[in-house]
Amino acid sequence: GVDLMSDYVYELAKKHHSVRKFKDQPLSEDVVRKLVEAGQSASTSSYLQTSSIIGVEDPEIKAQLKEVSGQHYVVDNGYLFVFVLDYYRHSLINEGVEPHMETSFESAEGLLVGAIDVALVSENIALAAEDMGYGIVYLGSLRNDVGRVREILDLPEYAFPLFGMAVGEPAEDENGSPKPRLPFEHIFHKNVYNSNKAQQKETLNAYDQMVSKYYQDRTNGVRNETWSQQVAGFLSGKARLDMLEQLNKAGLMKR
C-alpha cells in the first residue's frame, strides 16, 4: 500500500551529485548485472525496448573514448557504460514483416521514443548505483565525435550512442555536492504553462543569486558566476552542429 512516511528514495534522489573522482576499484560482474537489470526494468514506450548498453572494460577502448571525451574519468572509474539508442534489433524484425516498419524508426518520433527510453534506463541505473553507495557521472562528451564513437564501439546501422556513464566508489577526497536546482515554483506549472515574463524573470534573478553564492561558498570566492551566465556561455557556443548529419548516417531522423 501507500506509505506516506517513507522518504528513502526521495532523500536518495535529492542527494545526487556528479562524482568525477573514483577509487581504483572495479565493479564486480554481479554488481554490473544488477545495475543493467535495474535499468531494463524502466518504463519503455509501447514495449519497444529501444535501448542497448555497452559495458566498456577494455582499457584500450576506454583510452580511445577518452580521446573523444577529453575527460580523465572516462578511463579512471569503476565501470564505464555507454547508452545506445538501438533500432538495429527492430530492423532485423523488419526484414520478415510487411508492411515494413522503417518509416517509424527512421522518423523524428522514433528518435524521441528511443532517446526517452534510453534516458529512463540510465536513470534507473544511476539511482540503483547510488543506492549501493557508488557515485556516477553522465558523459554527454562522447557526442563530441559520434562518428568516431560508433566506429570504436562497432555500432551497426540504427544504433546511436547518446551518452556514457562512469560509475565507481567515490574517492576519499571527492567533495562534490548537490547544486541548487531551479525553484519548484519555476518548473512546476499547474494546469497551464505560466509564461508571465515578469514573474519568470524575477524568479530567475533570485535563483541566479543563489547559484552565485553556492559557487562563492564552495570556492572561497574564486567563482561567482550565475546560472544565467553559465547557460548563455554554453548555449552560445557552436558545438556539435553536425548531429543531424550523424543521426542520418546511422539511419535515423530521415523523416
Task: Name the predicted role of every residue range.
Residues 1-255:
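Acidic, surface-exposed loops and disordered segments
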